[in-house]
């Protein structure tokens, strides 16, 4: 009963809380930051030596440093190894019920290397459920059947189920036909799945008719969005959720907004011209685990300052992938220059006959390219060479490679940089 009340309180509080200006939002953030940072210095040994409650006094952590300090960044002193052991055992059983010291333990996909580990207490799960419902449901009065296709489920998602909301987790590890059948049987009104799954379902399950469709857990490419929208007859929205928090969601106008009411976002700009940045986030509500000045590995392209929905929350034009996968080339004028994955995707997928591709950059800047269908290899090569020349970059060796073996639960990485 207590958890349901927490969920209801979070739902109502989030749904009806409106910020009339950026100033009002920033006042809310400052209040929450004061509470979070003051508690962090008291509760988490990692921050015991931090001299003040000023956010700038706290170090910026990436995944490696955060995992290295894991036992000092959770309020139970749990070690990384014991949490990993519990979570991996649960994943092998496909049960996703791992728990250590009363905290649920979940794993990230490990796209950027080592898997992240997240801990949630029952009260945090209840609050997350309320916030998610408030932001994702088009109506609070109409019944909803919510289907989520993901690599892993667990208490964090199960906490949504009940009452007027029916929830169904579908295991991404299932064969595509089985996923489609389970969704047909459930007939969701709201469907959330990785973009490649949505793309497959359009062809495989024409009888599915969700009223709302969310792309989750991977980069939504333009050509996939067009096919999915045409297939389901509704716009594809995005839900930006990571191990580190509920980071953003599309509004009714299709604009992706950062959840700045839940997380404080600092921007590490990586391209001055476009404003592309890597977010450094501080969770304003999490308690079991410290997410303070955590550098995400994503590259975000800022959106317009204003949105027709009237929200003052910052907008994102596109989530472009991992910062680690920004390609690096020698410029013809000298020096090194980045090439963002979004440009590569657009050019290669726009080449004649190309349906899909995988591109890997080696430490020596050479490229390995796999293309579907195989007969499109030459046109993909030419398109890639043309892009590099147009950007004023030295064209390295480009070699064809076999299509890589990919687990069905793995995130799709079309563009990847090694080393």
Please tell me what each predicted stretch does.
Residues 1-107, 113-127, 133-138, 152, ...:
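Nucleotide 5′-phosphate-binding alpha/beta core
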Residues 1-31, 35-38, 165-419:
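Active-site glycine/GP-rich loop and adjacent strand/helix microenvironment
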Residues 108-112, 162-164, 209:
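Acidic/polar active-site rim loop that often engages polyanionic ligands
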Residues 114, 141-144, 187-188:
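Short coil/turn connectors at secondary-structure junctions
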Residues 116-117, 126-128, 153-159, 200-201, ...:
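Short, well-ordered, mixed-charge alpha-helical segments that flank or form enzyme active sites
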Residues 119-121, 148-150, 194-195, 240:
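Glycine-rich, histidine-containing beta strand-loop boundary motifs that form or position
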Residues 119-120, 158-160, 203, 291-293:
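A short secondary-structure junction signal
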Residues 133-170:
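Conserved AMP-binding loop of ANL adenylate-forming enzymes
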């Amino acid at each position: 009963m207590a958890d349901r009340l927490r969920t209801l309180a979070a739902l109502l509080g989030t749904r009806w809380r409106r910020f009339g200006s950026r100033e009002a939002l920033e006042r809310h953030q400052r209040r929450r930051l004061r509470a979070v940072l003051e508690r962090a210095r008291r509760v988490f040994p990692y921050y015991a030596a931090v001299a003040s409650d000023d956010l700038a006094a706290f170090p910026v952590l990436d995944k490696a440093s955060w995992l290295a300090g894991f036992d000092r960044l959770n309020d139970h002193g749990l070690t990384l190894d014991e949490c990993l052991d519990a979570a991996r055992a649960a994943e092998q059983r496909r049960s996703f019920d791992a728990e250590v010291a009363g905290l649920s333990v979940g794993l990230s996909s490990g796209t950027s290397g080592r898997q992240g580990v997240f801990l949630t207490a029952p009260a945090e799960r209840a609050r997350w459920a309320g916030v998610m419902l408030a932001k994702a449901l088009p109506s609070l009065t109409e019944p909803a059947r919510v289907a989520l296709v993901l690599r892993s489920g667990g208490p964090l998602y199960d906490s949504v189920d009940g009452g007027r909301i029916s929830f169904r987790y579908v295991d991404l590890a299932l064969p595509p036909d089985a996923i489609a059948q389970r969704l047909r049987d459930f007939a969701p009104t709201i469907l959330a799945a990785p973009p490649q799954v949505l793309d497959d379902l359009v062809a495989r399950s024409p009888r599915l008719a969700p009223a709302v469709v969310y792309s989750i857990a991977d980069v939504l490419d333009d050509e996939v969005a067009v096919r999915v929208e045409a297939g389901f007859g509704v716009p594809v929205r995005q839900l930006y959720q990571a191990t580190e928090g509920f980071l953003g969601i599309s509004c009714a106008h299709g604009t992706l907004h950062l959840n700045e009411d839940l997380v404080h976002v600092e921007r590490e700009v990586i391209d001055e011209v476009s404003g592309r940045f890597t977010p450094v986030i501080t969770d304003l509500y999490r308690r079991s685990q410290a997410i303070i000045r955590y550098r995400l590995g994503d590259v975000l392209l800022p959106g317009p300052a204003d949105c027709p929905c009237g929200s003052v929350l910052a907008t994102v034009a596109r989530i472009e992938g991992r910062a680690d996968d920004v390609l690096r080339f020698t410029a013809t004028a000298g020096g090194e220059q980045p090439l963002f994955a979004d440009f590569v995707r657009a050019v290669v997928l726009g080449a004649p006959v190309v349906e899909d591709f995988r591109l890997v950059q080696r430490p020596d800047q050479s490229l390995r390219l796999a293309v579907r269908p195989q007969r499109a290899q030459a046109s993909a090569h030419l398109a890639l060479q043309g892009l590099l020349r147009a950007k004023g970059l030295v064209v390295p060796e480009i070699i064809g490679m076999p299509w890589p073996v990919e687990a069905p639960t793995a995130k799709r990485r079309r563009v990847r940089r090694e080393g």
